[in-house]
Curated annotation (Swiss-Prot):
Molecular functions per Gene Ontology: methionyl-tRNA formyltransferase activity
Enzyme superclass (EC): transferase
InterPro entries reported for this sequence: Fmt (IPR005794), Formyl_trans_C (IPR005793), Formyl_transf_N (IPR002376), Formyl_transf_N_sf (IPR036477), Formyl_transferase-like_C_sf (IPR011034), Met-tRNA-FMT_C (IPR044135), Met-tRNA-FMT_N (IPR041711)
Residues that, per the record, bind (6S)-5,6,7,8-tetrahydrofolate: 110-113
Stored Gene3D superfamilies: 3.40.50.12230
Entry-linked Pfam families: Formyl_trans_C, Formyl_trans_N
Family recorded in the similarity comment: Belongs to the Fmt family.
Species for this entry: Frankia casuarinae (strain DSM 45818 / CECT 9043 / HFP020203 / CcI3)
Role played: Attaches a formyl group to the free amino group of methionyl-tRNA(fMet). The formyl group appears to play a dual role in the initiator identity of N-formylmethionyl-tRNA by promoting its recognition by IF2 and preventing the misappropriation of this tRNA by the elongation apparatus.
CDD domains reported for this sequence: FMT_core_Met-tRNA-FMT_N (cd08646), Met_tRNA_FMT_C (cd08704)
EC number(s) reported in the record: 2.1.2.9
Organism placement in taxonomy: Bacteria, Bacillati, Actinomycetota, Actinomycetes, Frankiales
Keywords: Protein biosynthesis, Transferase
Protein known as: Methionyl-tRNA formyltransferase
Length: 337
């Protein structure tokens, strides 16, 4: 089939590569979001999908808005049979949806109808789900509501970050997307309507949501830190400055379903008050939560790069009884990292 692929970030690359490599399909163009400033220097760079398309010699369309008449005319002129989509990042208008004869077919990283929306993987980790997956479905005007061509399942590992899980789903999902394209071309697959039960939504994880409340149970702190890694990054405050927190380690009593890490000796008999930070004799950095303490792994102080929590603690010389993140002590917009 003649395909016009739509996608923007790195998570879309496995699918684009798989479709380019498929002998059964011809990717005649790629649609991606316009170049944007990125990184610490805020230099304008093309998104990863644009870069791969250039390397493969595939024409790239980067409309500011997919409803622009010029873009719609160009798309119609390409006469695509189908438009596969992975993390494009913009809503497609009905005029665009009507152009390919087999419509637009999206790879979504959840088991629909669960977690419709922009952040299904992060919401999966926040909820503590053990099982997730990916769905390939027909795009309709309503968000992520179209009939489903196929699904795959993936176990959530106890230490998964959103980046880890998304990488696995992107690789596995690429094969599923190609299989669906093959089935559409052969006329052997038909989409099945999503059930009316089990619908949930996955809005983008905001910076405010990513702020750690140390009064919550250790398992909730663990889930938030993993869900927010690599973005937007879980965070707290220390001495009125923002401190990003990477994945933490839980003690055996903290509630992780598998793979507990016993906390080392040196903690007070009653544990630590919520938010209180303590450097243990072996150098580990413990923080109290609403249940049992967690051990910090990697942290990122405001204006600096990531570092081991032990190295950070040595540098700041934590005083006895110091705490992290008094709720309400700092506006969410304050500071940079």
């Amino acid at each position: 089939m003649r395909l016009v692929f739509a996608g923007t970030p790195a998570v879309a690359l496995p699918s684009l590569r798989a479709l380019i490599d498929s002998p059964r399909h011809d990717v005649v163009a790629v649609v991606t979001r316009p170049d944007r400033p990125s990184g610490r220097g805020r230099k304008v760079k093309p998104p990863p999908v644009h870069v791969l398309a250039d390397e493969a010699g595939i024409p790239v369309l980067s409309p500011d808005r997919p409803r622009d008449p010029e873009f719609l005319a160009t798309l119609a002129g390409l006469a695509p049979d189908c438009c596969p989509v992975v993390a494009y990042g913009a809503l497609l208008p009905p005029a665009a949806l009507a152009i390919p004869r087999h419509g637009w077919v999206n790879l979504h990283f959840s088991l629909l109808p669960a977690y419709r929306g922009a952040a299904p993987v992060q919401r999966t980790l926040l909820a503590g789900d053990d099982l997730t997956g990916a769905s390939v479905f027909q795009i309709e005007p309503a968000m992520d509501s179209g009939p489903v061509y196929g699904v795959l399942t993936e176990r959530v590992r106890p230490t998964d970050t959103s980046g880890d899980l998304l990488d696995r789903l992107a690789e596995a999902g690429a094969g599923l997307l190609v299989a669906v394209m093959d089935g559409i071309a052969d006329g052997t697959v038909r989409p099945v309507a999503q059930p009316a039960e089990g619908i949930s939504f996955a809005p983008k994880l905001t910076a405010e949501e990513a702020r750690i409340d140390w009064t919550k149970p250790a398992i909730a702190v663990d889930r938030l830190a993993r869900a927010a890694t690599p973005a937007p990054g879980a965070w707290t405050t220390f001495r009125d400055r923002r401190l990003k927190i990477g994945p933490v380690r839980l003690g055996a009593v903290s509630g992780r379903p598998a793979g507990p890490v016993a906390l080392p000796a040196g903690l007070p008999a009653g544990g630590l008050p919520a938010g209180q930070i303590m450097v243990l004799p072996g150098g580990d950095v413990a923080v109290g939560t609403g249940t049992s303490p967690v051990l910090l792994g990697e942290v990122r102080p405001e204006g600096r790069g990531p570092m081991a929590a032990a190295a950070w603690a040595r540098g700041v010389r934590i005083a006895k009884g110091e705490t992290l993140g008094a709720i309400g002590a700092m506006p969410v917009s304050g500071g940079t990292s």
